[in-house]
A protein has these predicted regions:
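Sparse, context-dependent recognition of short Cys/His-centered cofactor- or disulfide-binding micro-motifs
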Residues: 7-10, 64, 84-91, 124-128, ...
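Surface-exposed, low-hydrophobicity interaction/linker segments
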Residues: 28-87
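An acidic, glycine-/histidine-flanked metal-binding catalytic module
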Residues: 1-52, 153-213
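Short low-complexity stretches enriched in small and charged residues
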Residues: 20-23, 54-64, 105-114, 198-199
Length: 213
């Protein structure tokens, strides 16, 4: 059971995202391989055939129309990019953990991190950055019924972090730009030197990272 007294859980429920709906939205793989296994254990052809089926399913899922939280369904090109990037280093459930992803804007991360959750949930705390910092900030909640079901992701961001994350996604991610650039841009954002999308682009394109701090 979810702790309904937690304001974060209460907010999700008010928007229609309940544990019962997460269970109904969960899709079980028919490949017969646990998602805790490395990607190399999967047939690439069969995996992507199933991923296409899963995305088609979500694109026609009526339950999603009853949930008042922004969501997105990942496209196959993005999944292929992640597959090729992490083929030798990641478990499948760490790569395909956000085919269906919800995004909740919240005032702070304390309530999110304080949630008491059933074993089907896993929290990834990136409120102070990733292990290898690329500028992103947030807390991700992954729901997975068992190791043969595709995970569902719920992203929690403050409005301030969400704004910067969106600029990162638009101008930095998937463009072969080193992680350190995102981390440096974040520093400028926190120091007040980046206050708008225009500022972000000017700092990114202005060669400022060739200078000594």
């Amino acid at each position: 059971m979810l702790d309904k007294n937690n304001p974060c859980i209460s907010n999700l429920a008010q928007c229609g995202l309940t544990l019962e709906k997460l269970e109904k939205l969960s899709v079980k793989s028919n490949l017969g391989v646990s998602f805790v296994e490395d990607l190399g254990r999967f047939s690439k052809e069969e995996l992507f055939k199933e991923l296409q089926t899963v995305t088609d399913h979500y694109n026609n899922e009526a339950i999603l129309t009853t949930i008042d939280i922004p969501f997105r369904i990942k496209d196959l090109n993005s999944m292929l990019h992640n597959y090729e990037r992490y083929y030798y280093t990641k478990e499948a459930n760490r790569v395909f953990n956000d085919i269906l992803g919800f995004r909740s804007v919240y005032t702070n991360y304390d309530d999110v991190l304080a949630m008491e959750l059933p074993e089907q949930f896993r929290i990834s705390d990136m409120s102070h950055g990733k292990t290898i910092d690329d500028g992103y900030r947030g807390v991700h909640l992954h729901y997975q019924m068992d190791e043969f079901h595709y995970p569902i992701e719920i992203q929690f961001n403050t409005e301030w972090d969400l704004q910067f994350n969106q600029w990162l996604h638009k101008y930095v991610y998937k463009k072969s730009i080193p992680n350190i650039i995102g981390a440096l841009l974040r520093r400028y954002y926190e120091n007040g030197k980046i206050k708008s999308e225009t500022d972000f682009k000017e700092v990114l394109n202005g060669g400022i990272f060739n200078r000594k701090e």
